[in-house]
A protein has these predicted regions:
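Short, non-helical or kinked segments that cap or interrupt transmembrane helices
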Residues: 49-50, 72-84, 137-146, 191-197, ...
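Hydrophobic, membrane-embedded alpha-helices of multi-pass small-molecule transporters
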Residues: 17-32, 171-175, 193-194, 235-266, ...
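Membrane-embedded alpha-helical modules
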Residues: 103-213, 331-441
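N-terminal signal-anchor module of multipass membrane proteins
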Residues: 1-76, 86-105
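Juxtamembrane interface elements at the cytosolic ends of transmembrane helices
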Residues: 2-4, 34-38, 42, 175-182, ...
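Intrinsically disordered, low-complexity non-transmembrane regions of multi-pass membrane transporters
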Residues: 1-21, 214-238, 272-276, 287, ...
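Interfacial segments of multi-pass membrane proteins
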Residues: 88-93, 183, 312-327, 333-337
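Membrane-embedded helical hairpins/re-entrant loop segments and their flanking transmembrane helices
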Residues: 42-67, 254-324
């Protein structure tokens, strides 16, 4: 019962049907967060914001771009980035210059144009990494920095898990319990798809309760199927081309400095999970190129910025299937769903409480990976400098809940708490004497 599951690096040995199910599991893990970004942006733009269909197809194609750039080696899914929400909100509220008489829908392409430039900044960093060498770059990112950052990635998501779960604790607990049961006691295929089983079984329970007239504790309905009924079966995603303006560029592009730090943390987490050093091979410059191209492509056609997803790192840890082919299947599913508004809305109808129950496990797993990263690399916490670096990262990553917002050229720029933690951690590690870690090339 307590034996560690053997890692699977080639899912083809499981057979096609099982691979398809594993891809479905990754898709469910990313779906809620991916479609939440356009939902939130729509509130900023009074219903004239991002399209869920465009978001899904851009996430799918962006993920495939990323895999091509990384030699098909890194099992990462790229979904919608939350880091740019503050930028979208700022652009929506611009009312000077060319934005003075614009409708909300007319402002959106300019926000996307700023994200295209942000994607280009990733390519600049990739060039720097390639020119100076990853070893020199990684001198600033030892385990005493990346480990606590990974811990913060998971813990910073924890409030989201609790907020979703508390809408109906019964369903959340069922989803969580099913995942634990299948992960610990499951046999064969069921042992490597615990999240998918948690989603399916809790969804069935929720639907039965819904049909029996049971409501959430706050009186709201467990399901809302109006959007499903109104959606068509097949429709093309409503693409729109981005536009450029220096004001919106100054709002959106600097956010890339924050998301680049998060990217390094995510790639470190995936490396720690799979036991493969992806910062070394295929290289940090390649992962940055993949993320940058995916972000620029998505925004060019009216989608949100893409980013490597921590949720899918949690899936990797639970299933112990590390084959990137499975993640590419999830990308294909996302692309297919983008052409069917009705199916997308059906999956989107998944109760928030179930998402919360699943997230309890996934987000905790991410933080546990960070702890493991520190332990396996034998970080010496008897040294005061290591304690200080880790302490500042943890407090900053969890303490600056909404980040820090400051004004540049009359526009607001927000550094997320994770970006602040990464910047402070990297700076302290560089300044304080007594470094005891060498990156292995």
């Amino acid at each position: 019962m307590n034996q560690k599951k053997e890692a699977i690096y080639d899912a083809r040995e499981l057979g096609v049907p099982k691979m398809l199910l594993l891809g479905l599991q990754h898709m469910f893990a990313m779906f809620g967060a991916t479609i939440l970004v356009p939902i939130l942006v729509n509130t900023y733009f009074n219903g004239e914001g991002l399209s869920i269909q465009v978001t899904l197809i851009c996430a799918g194609i962006g993920t495939l771009f990323f895999h091509l750039c990384t030699k098909l080696k890194v099992p990462a899914f790229l979904g919608s980035s939350f880091a740019f929400l503050g930028g979208f909100h700022t652009v929506a509220n611009l009312d000077t210059g060319i934005f003075k008489d614009m409708s909300m829908g007319e402002k959106l392409p300019y926000a996307c144009g700023g994200i295209v430039v942000a994607g280009a900044l990733y390519l600049v960093l990739a060039l720097v990494v390639k020119l100076v060498g990853v070893k020199r770059v990684m001198r600033f990112l030892p385990p005493v920095v990346t480990g606590p950052i990974i811990i913060c990635i998971g813990l910073s998501l924890a409030p989201s898990a609790v907020n979703n779960a508390k809408t109906n604790w019964i369903l959340a607990i069922i989803a969580f319990a099913v995942i634990v049961i299948f992960n610990i006691w499951g046999k064969g295929m069921f042992k490597i798809i615990p999240i998918l089983m948690g989603v399916v079984i809790s969804y069935v329970v929720a639907f039965i309760l819904f049909k029996c007239g049971v409501h959430n504790p706050d009186g709201s309905a467990i399901f809302t199927f109006k959007a499903v009924k109104d959606a068509g079966w097949v429709d093309l995603p409503p693409f729109q081309l981005c536009k450029f303006n220096i004001t919106s560029i100054l709002v959106m592009a600097p956010i890339a400095l924050a998301t680049m730090m998060e990217h390094i943390g995510d790639i470190s987490a995936i490396s720690a999970t799979t036991g493969n050093n992806f910062i070394k091979d295929p290289g940090l410059h390649r992962t940055q190129i993949g993320d940058g191209l995916a972000t620029a492509f998505a925004a060019a056609f009216g989608g949100p910025a893409n980013t490597t997803y921590g949720e899918n790192t949690g899936v990797l840890e639970l299933s112990r299937v590390y084959d990137p082919r499975v993640v590419r299947l999830a990308a294909v599913y996302a692309i297919l769903l983008s052409f069917s508004p009705k199916v997308a809305e059906c999956i989107g109808s998944l109760p928030a409480s179930i998402i919360g129950g699943v997230s309890f496990m996934l987000y905790g797993m991410i933080s546990a990976i960070g702890v493991r990263n520190v332990v396996e690399n034998k970080v010496d916490f008897t040294k005061s400098r290591n304690l200080i670096v880790a302490a500042v990262i943890l407090v900053s990553g969890l303490g600056f809940g909404n980040g820090i917002t400051f004004t540049v050229a009359g526009t607001s720029i927000t550094l997320t708490s994770l970006a602040i933690a990464a910047i402070l951690g990297i700076a302290l590690n560089a300044i304080l004497p007594g470094k005891d870690y060498e990156f292995d090339e």
